[in-house]
Structure formats: C-alpha cells, structure tokens
Amino acid sequence: MATTKPYRVLLYYMYTTIENPEEFAAEHLEFCNSLELKGRILVAKEGINGTCSGTVEQTEKYMEAMNNDPRFDGIVFKIDEADGHAFKKMHVRPRPELVTLRLEDDINPHEITGKYLEPKDFYEAMKQEDTVIIDARNDYEFDLGHFKGAIKPDIESFRELPDWIRENKEVLEGKKILTYCTGGIRCEKFSGWLVREGYEDVSQLHGGIVTYGKDPEVQGELWDGQCYVFDERIAVPVNQKEHVIVGKDHFTGEPCERYVNCANPECNKKILCSEENEAKYLRACSHECRVSPRNRYVIQHELTEEQVAAALEQIEAGK
C-alpha cells in the first residue's frame, strides 16, 4: 500500500471466541500502550471490535501480532492514512456484547447472518426495484451522510432497531432488504436477526461504508454526504465522484457537515452547526441548554452573565 501520510487509522472487528475478555483486555491494553497506539477497542466473549491510530510502523506491528494470533485468523483491517493520531488515549474495555442489541436470544453471525454483498454487487442491488435499503446506524450518523434512497430508522441507539423494524414491517414485507453500517459489524447481527424474523431476501454490505468508499470500481457512488466515524476526525469522505452535502445546520437548516456536542453536559446531543452558529447559540441545542449553569461553551469562553444575556436577547430578536 502506497503511503503518503505518517499515521494510520485502523478499523476492524472479528466475531471469534475470547474465553476471558477481562484478562485479554488488560493484556491487550498493555500491548497497545507498548506500541504507543491510541484508540478504543471493545472485547467480549464473542470477539473484538476496534479502531486505533499510530504511525505506519506501530500499526504494522499491531496488525502483524493480530494476524499471528490464531483466534484472529482471517481478520480484515480497514486502513486510512492520517496526519496524526485520531484519538487522545488508548482504551481496551471488556463488554457483554460487541454491539449492543440486548436480544433475549442473541444472534451468532457464524450461525445466521444475511448474504454478503461486495461493493459492486451492493451498488447494483441498490438500483433494483422492490429493494429497500436500511441504514443500521444511529440517526446522527444518517444525518451526516447515507446512501441515496436509504430508509432512516428513527432511532438513537442500535438496540432500538429491532423494535423499529417490528413497528414498520409493512415497509419491508415482500421486498429485497439491503442493510449497511460503518464497517460491517452491526449488520452481521442485524441482518441475522432479520433472517430469524422471517425475512427471506436479506443482504448486507460486506466491509461496510468504509470499504465501499475505497472500492476502485464503485468509488463510493450513490453515497451522499460523509461517513460519521467514532474518532476525532468525526467525518470521512465516501463518494469519490461527487460530494453532495446532506447535513443541515441545527439552527438555520443550511448545508452543514460540522458536528459539535451540545454544551450542556446533561444533554451532550450531537448537532450539526457552523462555527458562526456555535458562537451565536452558545453551542447549545435549546434555550434550556443555553441557560444551563454547566454550559461548557460559556465556561470555556469565560462569558459573563451580561454577555450570556446579550446572546439570549439577540437570539430572541432574530426569531
């Protein structure tokens, strides 16, 4: 792989048996720290789900070690070049599940999952009639970017998806179902759940959006916006042929691809907004959050009560 930037961001997962996740997590954290990697890795009895950053040399050593562990035989790393670290710290945490569905009867993707479609096949399938495309991500991920014509489930977390499907089953009945997520891990379980629910024609994008955007043949075509990623980059491009902005500023509705967290720590909602509107609205999604005594924007910028009052007055005057 030709390298032009000094750092890399790795994204990977694998459903495989890890007998003692707590012990593995502690040892793996020590190993990652010895390589000076930064990132976030989740470990469960059902496998591993990680994203981390480091120099080319550090990430090469990490991938080599993982490939040499028989538990991770066949693991696939999605690699992005970067100018620096994409994370501030290194976390390796044991979890009950790699992705939180909290099903009473869990799905094992080795036993049941939807058909895997490579990017070109997924591209062709999206253009067919009687096909529904379901985004298996959260609402704020969809709002930044999605495939043309994809359905946005009204959910704030992955575990809400099965209930949404049951409440909206008329949308799916008799249709070919395509589903996708960032790197593929959520769809492994979600597509398997759909099959178990009785849907007969269920396919998933193999390798997720990240792989689709890098595919030399499809080049991210039929994707609008950017792809939300869970690191300091926040967003990465997908469509190499055209860039259509689908994100809308929380306050004005204007095209926007800049995410911030609401300044009220009790809310912390992700909102799309310009730098100008961040300042104007004190980085708060609502009036209640603007006047919160814990508003981080107010504290960070050391705004006086008079300055906050003036900002609130200006917002009222503009309504």
Curated annotation (Swiss-Prot):
InterPro entries: Rhodanese-like_dom, Rhodanese-like_dom_sf, Rhodanese_C, TrhO, TRHO_N
Catalytic center residues: C181
Keywords noted in UniProt: Oxidoreductase, tRNA processing
CDD domains xrefs: RHOD_YceA
Signal peptide segment: none
PROSITE patterns membership: RHODANESE_3
Database matches in SMART domains: RHOD
Catalysed reaction, written as an equation: uridine(34) in tRNA + AH2 + O2 = 5-hydroxyuridine(34) in tRNA + A + H2O
Top EC class of this enzyme: oxidoreductase
Entry keyword Oxidoreductase: yes
Superkingdom assignment: Bacteria
Function according to Swiss-Prot or TrEMBL: Catalyzes oxygen-dependent 5-hydroxyuridine (ho5U) modification at position 34 in tRNAs.
Annotated HAMAP family: TrhO (MF_00469)
Family recorded in the similarity comment: Belongs to the TrhO family.
Protein name, as recorded: tRNA uridine(34) hydroxylase
Species name: Bacillus cereus (strain ZK / E33L)
Lineage: Bacteria, Bacillati, Bacillota, Bacilli, Bacillales
